[in-house]
Amino acid sequence: MLKPLGDRVVIEVLEAEEKTASGIVLPDSAKEKPQSGKIVAVGSGRVLENGTKEPLEVAEGDTVIFAKYSGTEVTYEGTDYLILRESDILAITK
């Protein structure tokens, strides 16, 4: 499994909708870039200026909404993930 460093998290991105509300099937080029996903791994935390480490506010298993064009897309063992900094996460959904 991927283990992110510092204040980074690994997210399994939730797929974009395949159809519109009226039932029209969308081609890949017309789909919105997904902005939500499930956190599968978190780093150890961010290092503050005084040298102490602050743990992340998010945890494995959280479903989050993140900035549209943030992070780095990676494929690991056949699964697509997004690695991004905690500051790119906008909200945790409950």
Swiss-Prot record:
Record keyword Cell membrane present: no
Location in or out of the cell: Cytoplasm
Family, as annotated: Belongs to the GroES chaperonin family.
GO biological process: chaperone cofactor-dependent protein refolding
Function: Together with the chaperonin GroEL, plays an essential role in assisting protein folding. The GroEL-GroES system forms a nano-cage that allows encapsulation of the non-native substrate proteins and provides a physical environment optimized to promote and accelerate protein folding. GroES binds to the apical surface of the GroEL ring, thereby capping the opening of the GroEL channel.
PANTHER family per the UniProt record, alphabetical: 10 KDA HEAT SHOCK PROTEIN (PTHR10772), CO-CHAPERONIN GROES (PTHR10772:SF58)
Keyword Chaperone assigned: yes
SMART domains to which the protein is assigned, alphabetical: Cpn10 (SM00883)
GO molecular function, one term: ATP binding
Any one of the GO CC terms: cytoplasm
Protein name: Co-chaperonin GroES
Pfam families in UniProt: Cpn10
Assembly, per entry: Heptamer of 7 subunits arranged in a ring. Interacts with the chaperonin GroEL.
Keyword tags: Chaperone, Cytoplasm
Signal sequence segment: none
HAMAP family from the UniProt entry: CH10
